[in-house]
Amino acid sequence: MNKKMSLRMKLFVLITLVVIITFSSVSTIVSYRSIGMAREDAFALADEMSVKYSYEIRAELQAARVTSESLMTVFKTLIERGEADRDTLNTILQNSLRQKEYIISFCVAFEPNKLDGKDAEYAGQYPLYGKSGRYAPYWSLQNGEIDVEPLEDFDNDVWYAGARDTGGEYITDPFFYEVQGTPVLMTSLVFPIIIDGDFIGIVS
């Protein structure tokens, strides 16, 4: 009797272990497949979202490109006609910034004395003009507030030098720049202002 019970107990334990191992294996396989399916779904969703946002970003970049190129044409025309004064340019930039929600900042920067020959008169007149008096205001819009600050010592910065040296449209890689105290990830689209083959500045 004891031997029979012992044998039965051994069989029971053995069968139970087999069932447990089998169940565990099945659970592991199901879990593994579930993880795999979840990962595939995540990749598919990420791919779908990347396509969606890439189209949106491309559309916004194209809109910003058209706006910057249009401003460059307007400023070039004003300069050629002798009608480009600083107040007019500042007003155009402010109005454009308020009307274009996809743009957070505008910059128009000229070579020394290439706008009106009056850099010395405007030297140190902050916040529009820096120590040199060059026309290079950086207009930004953040939380509905427009702000301006002068750009200085920018001749070798990639966004300025790129357009100047190539003589054509220049697009920077995305970079962080502080706008009204807040770091913002942005891309600059820069157009050179060239008159009679002479580079005189940029619109960005």
Predicted regions and their residues:
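Juxtamembrane extracytoplasmic/periplasmic/luminal helical "stalk" adjacent to the first N-terminal
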Residues: 7-15, 19-87, 92-95, 102
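Short linear functional motifs in flexible/disordered or boundary regions
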Residues: 46, 62, 80, 105, ...
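Structured segments of extracytoplasmic/periplasmic soluble domains
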Residues: 56, 71-74, 78, 92-100, ...
